[in-house]
UniProtKB/Swiss-Prot annotation:
Its biological purpose: Involved in the modulation of the activity of the glucose-phosphotransferase system (glucose-PTS). Interacts with the transcriptional repressor Mlc, preventing its interaction with DNA and leading to the modulation of expression of genes regulated by Mlc, including ptsG, which encodes the PTS system glucose-specific EIICB component.
Entry's localization field: Cytoplasm
SUPFAM superfamilies attached to this UniProt entry: Metalloproteases ('zincins'), catalytic domain
Gene: mtfA
Protein name: Mlc titration factor A
GO cellular component: cytosol
The entry's keywords: Aminopeptidase, Cytoplasm, Hydrolase, Metal-binding, Metalloprotease, Protease, Zinc
Enzyme class, UniProt record, top EC level: hydrolase
Lineage: Bacteria, Pseudomonadati, Pseudomonadota, Gammaproteobacteria, Enterobacterales
Cofactor(s) required for function per UniProt: Zn(2+)
Main location (coarse class): cytoplasm
Family listed: Belongs to the MtfA family.
């Protein structure tokens, strides 16, 4: 069990979100005008339904809130905002945070450990994030903290805990599980050859199926050119689940020549 040392500060009154500025981040460059319009509509509903809570002196403004909402809604652009049910608050630390982790081993001994976290989500309860990693999620590099935690939430809709298999038709579960485990094995083989830091896919994906789904969801939306050719069968399953094809969107985008790693603050 993790004990969270948060102390919420009063959420400031937000002005009307500057959506045009909020959309001007690399990960959203390839969206069509129609998709941007629908994404903003979802993000507006997100901000009406959820409370973004700044912690430890983090200064929240309307632009930050808008970008957070847009990234939360990108994975559910075709699924619908109801897929984000089950939580009401998003807690934002200014940077990765230390928490007390309490766990019991196989013989019943209770251990306490202080660990650094970037984010956390539960089936019922808030999503906890940090601004440093949110800001690093604006580019198209394969890293996206918000999409990672949203993927866990979507995964948990299929049961009590994240399993790596989201809510899909029963007839597709065996194929999904097979392709996901094959991807994990492939990533682990690369790690064994080159090491974790040199792996072309975040090594965290090889730790368990739930993390593989969450990590590959990051790549699905922010680096589809790395995901699709490497795991084509799993890629098609992700396209079917999310109802989106970010690689096709990227290829058809007039912004395709824009640098995918532009830093936005």
């Amino acid at each position: 069990m993790i004990k969270w040392p948060w102390k919420a500060q009063e959420t400031p009154q937000q002005d009307n979100p500057p959506w045009e500025d909020a959309l001007a981040i690399p990960i959203l460059h390839s969206l069509t005008t129609e998709e941007q319009t629908r994404l903003v509509a979802l993000a507006e509903r997100f901000l009406q339904q959820k409370r973004i809570v700044p912690l430890q002196g983090f200064e929240l403004d309307s632009l930050k809130s808008a970008r957070i909402a847009l990234l939360f809604c990108l994975p559910v652009l075709e699924l619908g905002i109801e897929w984000l049910d089950g939580f009401h608050e998003v807690l934002i630390y200014p940077a990765p945070f230390v928490v007390d982790d309490e766990w019991e081993d196989d013989i019943g001994l209770v251990h306490n450990q202080r660990i650094v976290q970037s984010g956390q989500s539960w089936q019922q309860g808030p999503i906890v994030l940090n601004w440093v990693d949110i800001r690093d999620s604006f580019d198209a590099s394969g890293f996206n903290l918000i999409i990672h935690e949203v993927a866990h939430k979507l995964d948990m809709r299929n049961g009590d805990r994240a399993s790596g298999i989201p809510l899909i038709p029963l007839r597709e579960v065996a194929g999904w599980e097979h392709d996901l485990h094959a991807a994990m094995e492939n990533i682990q083989e690369e790690i064994d050859l080159v090491g974790e830091t040199a792996s072309s896919i975040d090594a965290y994906a090889a730790t368990d199926p739930a993390e593989c789904f969450a990590v590959l969801s990051e790549y699905f939306f922010s680096a589809p050119e790395l995901f699709a050719p490497r795991f084509p069968s799993l890629w098609q399953r992700f396209c079917q689940f999310y109802g989106q094809n970010p690689l096709l969107r990227l290829r058809n985008s007039p912004n395709n020549d824009a640098s995918p790693t532009t830093n936005v603050h």
